[in-house]
């Protein structure tokens, strides 16, 4: 049950997610992006994985902080390991981010599930076999064919309802859209 190795592998995957100048996500044409998988391995060969982006699992951060805390430790001590890793954040000059801690936490839970041959939702007490999902609409934009008007939001919401969603979460317009925010436009979109 002792963690003996921490590895990061990179691969290409296809996404339709694009970001504007303020970092807000928008749909767009498919394109290739670099993706990373963080793997924790134990002495008996079990592995736990977490998929993330390369910036979250940079080699320096993994070597200096994650490996230092995890290697030689019992993976079942998830809470203590998380706190030990969080302790290093303060002195890391913002290199060890909450997202890195989250990626490690997911890999530890995945490792626990694989070791016990149980899905993680059962390990944390889940009892439902299905849950309702809501459709989340990306931020508004000024792009042709995007979410530039309240009517665009309405059409997209109708598409989500036709797909079976019972609830919809709106993200309306914000900078860098030139005229945002505008409460009247937000209300129209709703």
List PLM regions with ranges.
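Metal-dependent enolase-superfamily TIM-barrel catalytic cores that perform enediolate-based chemistry
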Residues: 130-131, 135-190
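Residue-level marker of alpha-helix boundaries and capping positions
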Residues: 28, 99-100, 147
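Residues that line or immediately flank small-molecule/substrate-binding pockets and catalytic motifs
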Residues: 10, 54, 172
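Metal- or metallocofactor-binding catalytic centers and their adjacent structured scaffolds
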Residues: 41-116
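A generic local secondary-structure boundary/capping motif
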Residues: 26-28, 122-123, 157
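Structured beta-strand/loop patches that form or line metal/cofactor-binding pockets in enzymes
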Residues: 1-49
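Glycine-rich, aromatic-flanked loop segments that form ligand/cofactor-binding clefts
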Residues: 105-140, 144
């Amino acid at each position: 049950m002792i963690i003996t190795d921490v590895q990061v592998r990179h691969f290409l995957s296809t996404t339709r997610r694009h970001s504007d100048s303020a970092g807000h996500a928008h749909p767009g044409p498919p394109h290739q992006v670099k993706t990373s998988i963080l793997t924790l391995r134990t002495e008996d060969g079990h592995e736990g994985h977490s998929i993330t982006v390369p910036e979250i699992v940079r080699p320096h951060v993994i070597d200096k902080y994650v490996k230092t805390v995890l290697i030689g430790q019992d993976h079942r001590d998830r809470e203590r390991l998380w706190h030990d890793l969080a302790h290093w954040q303060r002195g890391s000059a913002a290199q060890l981010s909450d997202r890195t801690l989250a990626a490690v936490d997911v890999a530890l839970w995945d490792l626990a599930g694989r070791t016990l041959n149980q899905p993680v939702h059962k390990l944390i007490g889940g009892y439902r076999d299905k849950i309702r999902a809501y459709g989340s609409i990306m931020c508004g934009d000024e792009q042709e064919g995007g979410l530039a008007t309240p009517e665009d939001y309405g059409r997209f919401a109708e598409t989500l309802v036709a797909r079976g969603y019972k609830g919809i979460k709106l993200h309306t317009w914000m900078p860098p859209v030139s005229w945002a925010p505008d409460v009247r436009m937000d209300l129209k979109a709703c």
